């Protein structure tokens, strides 16, 4: 779905972690409707894979200069199901899961939801390591950030 006046962008995201928790990285490829592309990445020295998956989408959406018609492609069912299904119930339950435990990564879920309200978003799950060029590139960016954080200083 494309809303009138909104630029189209396809976003491919991935997160990675060595150990869980451990050094982690995220990567995103943004493909704009006019043919332009942008790659962004980052990471943290002590994080989890799920935090990196969420951060990848957050940073990609935050990189957009205005409201867009977005297709987010993620290999994380945690991210896709969390934002499209679970978050409504979590909020109604005071950020508790169906088994009454505290929702993890609430800070990131709140920020992701805030950013989703700025755009028209279609969420797609893509199979990891299945040959999708842009998902593979996002994975490479994320893994590069992990490796950068694993280098032992001399």
Swiss-Prot record:
Q: Which domain of life, per UniProt? A: Bacteria
Q: Could you give one GO CC term from the UniProt record?
A: cytoplasm
Q: Which cofactor does it need?
A: Mg(2+)
Using the UniProt record, name the top-level EC class of this enzyme in a single word.
Answer: hydrolase
Q: RNA-binding: is it a keyword of this entry?
A: no
Keywords of the record: Cytoplasm, Endonuclease, Hydrolase, Magnesium, Metal-binding, Nuclease
User: Start and end of every RNase H type-1 domain?
Assistant: 5-147
The transmembrane residues are none
Bound cofactor: record note:
Binds 1 Mg(2+) ion per subunit. May bind a second metal ion at a regulatory site, or after substrate binding.
Its EC number is 3.1.26.4
Q: Give the binding site residues for Mg(2+) 1.
A: 14, 53, 75
Cell compartment(s), UniProt: Cytoplasm
Which GO BP annotation is one of this protein's? Answer: DNA replication, removal of RNA primer
Q: Which family does it belong to?
A: Belongs to the RNase H family.
Report what the protein is called: Ribonuclease H
Q: Give the originating organism.
A: Anaplasma marginale (strain St. Maries)
Lineage start: Bacteria, Pseudomonadati, Pseudomonadota, Alphaproteobacteria, Rickettsiales
